[in-house]
Amino acid sequence: MTMWSSSSEAAWAALWARYDVVLQSHKKSDLATLDAWYLATFPPILRVREPEPYVTQQELQHLMEWKLKKGKWRPQLMKFVSGLSESEVKQASLNAFKELKRGDLRAATEALCVLKGVGPATASAVLAAYDENVPFMADEALEAIAGIIGPRKYTLPHFLSFAEQLRAKAKWLNEQRAANDDEKAGDTESWTAQRVQLCLYVEAHDGAATGSVSSKKKAPSPAAKRKRDKPTTPTPAKKKEEKLQEESAKDQDQSLRRSQRKRQRPAA
């Protein structure tokens, strides 16, 4: 069963708790630092710029570096973003955040996609940094719900379907938490579409590690070894066969002894 079909909010919370561990397991140079910047440092910077938040050209480059490091490396995208001017990045992001505040995710995404090298996936990363109700269009999350929205595509319609599904899942998880009163456990953060996306990232990479181990030939466990070395208990049929063999051998032995005694008697 996949996490997406799980009916347990606690299972999702347990997966979320493993995010840092799984991220560190990749051992990609600077990934943890870049991820910390994207998730913890960058969002407050955007909010400080209210009421008209924007992204600088350098921040967009940094975000692209994070995106490519965490996913598939495509140097051409970095080249395009590096060639953008400060003014065009600022204006596009101003327009995007303005549309997002109005609740128009499509228009917000389109406003960023006018920039060369920025498609729906990169645009989603920019928007998610400002509003966690927008999920980053990560490959792992796309694959997790491919059975619902179709095979992975980096198009605007596909992103909108993706965002709708993850927002609905976040809403359901918050309802489950409220019903179970799980906030007493200490984690009082609400579920967001972005947090759901991060959980699916954990599932994909944690599961990949488990799968790679199970695909290798494992050494037998101590219990299995004891079971293997333990003498097997004969079946009833086997017992009967062994008894017949034993009786046959006994009869042959008695017959041989009678024959020997007969040869040893003195002649009349």
Language model: regions and residue ranges:
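Structural motif
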Residues: 48-59, 117, 182-194
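Short alpha-helix boundary/capping elements
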Residues: 67-72, 130-134, 204-205
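Short alpha-helical scaffolding segments that buttress acidic/His motifs in well-ordered protein cores
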Residues: 63-67, 126, 196-200
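Helix-hairpin-helix/helix-loop-helix acidic hairpins
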Residues: 73-118
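Alpha-helical interaction elements in eukaryotic regulators
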Residues: 55-59, 89-92, 104-108, 118, ...
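Small-residue-rich anion-binding loops in enzyme active sites
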Residues: 36-76
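C-terminal accessory module of base-excision DNA glycosylases/AP lyases that mediates lesion recognition
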Residues: 1-44, 134-268
